[in-house]
Design a protein with these regions (language model features):
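Short S/T/G/P-rich N-terminal loop/turn motif that feeds into the first structured element of a domain
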Residues: 5, 13, 17-101, 112-132
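Bacterial N-terminal signal peptides that target proteins for export
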Residues: 1-8
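Non-heme di-metal
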Residues: 106-107
């Protein structure tokens, strides 16, 4: 019985590992342009969410992150981090967003509000999920 439990546990771990395939994660490290601050950005994210809510692709997650500790605390004011479940959905999501009625205008304002000198696309593989 112990062997059966071990095999089942191994299969579950294997299955859950395969469920978390490598996925694209985009990072924008940004400083606020003169006259803008976090309250402006958060208001702008409300407009972003309204645009994205009207798109057929629901495979995008996004976070605003602010430095809590860094070896260079003045490098960025915030990070915009976005993630998709696949490269295919990332490409489709970009196309849908920029083709949306207000998508390109939203992005132009985002660029006016911030100077994002850091723009990186990475592949992320989840190696551990938090337990309850």
């Amino acid at each position: 019985m112990k062997t059966v439990k071990m095999v089942l546990a191994a299969l579950l771990v294997s299955a859950s590992t395969h469920a978390f395939a490598a996925n694209p994660v985009e990072f924008w490290g940004c400083k606020f342009a003169d006259g803008y601050d976090m309250s402006d950005l958060m208001a702008h994210t409300e407009a972003f969410n309204k645009i994205v809510d009207d798109l057929p692709d629901r495979k995008y997650s996004a976070w605003i992150m602010t430095p809590f500790f860094s070896n260079n605390m003045s490098a960025v004011d915030f990070w915009w981090v976005g993630a998709w479940d696949s490269n295919t959905n990332m490409g489709g999501g970009f196309d849908e967003f920029l083709a949306a009625k207000d998508g390109a205008a939203w992005f132009a304002k985002y660029q006016a509000m911030s100077n994002c000198e850091v723009h990186t696309l990475m592949t992320s593989t989840n190696i551990r999920m938090a337990s309850e």
